[in-house]
Amino acid sequence: DLDTVEPMIALPYHPSNAFPLREVIAEPEKYAKWVEEQAVKIFENTPDIHPNLEEKIVPYTDAAHALSDAFPIDRRIRVDQAAIAGCAAGSFENIYAVEQVAHESKKALGQFAFNVYPASQPIMVELNRIGAMNELMIHGVRVKTAFCGPCFGASDCPENNAFSIRHSTRNFPNREGSKPGQGQVASAALMD
């Protein structure tokens, strides 16, 4: 029964750092601190690396309060980049589901770098034929050609100290393209 499956997020810097997404949303400070503690251990021999996920925690403003004083009702981890890519994650079903969320929300999804890579050209053609690609682009999502790059850090490399969420098939240290030996690191979390 798929209704019993809980959405998870694999936090930086290892795929085993998986937690229920609802917990991370409910307690962002706790999990940001935990990620930073892991980074201290992982990058202990790289003194120039200072990831700061706690600075990504910002007030969240509900749309219902947007016309008032932008009343903060909660705090969330600000996402700098998102990508849906790869042979498994770029499926017709996944991208169509994102289009449905965009259509129902009536909000821009591309307020940060959000890239979608269909798994194949035939998938892209079909999503385009039914109007899903146009809907995503109207909502600010950048639609790119089928490409394996985001899965192994060959494209969509986040900026230094950025927080990136990704729905892709691979997860290993520095998989998003970070170069800790050169003083650059980003925090990538996988979502399924």
Segments the model singles out, each with a brief description of its role:
Residues 1-191:
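Fe-S-dependent hydro-lyases/dehydratases of central metabolism
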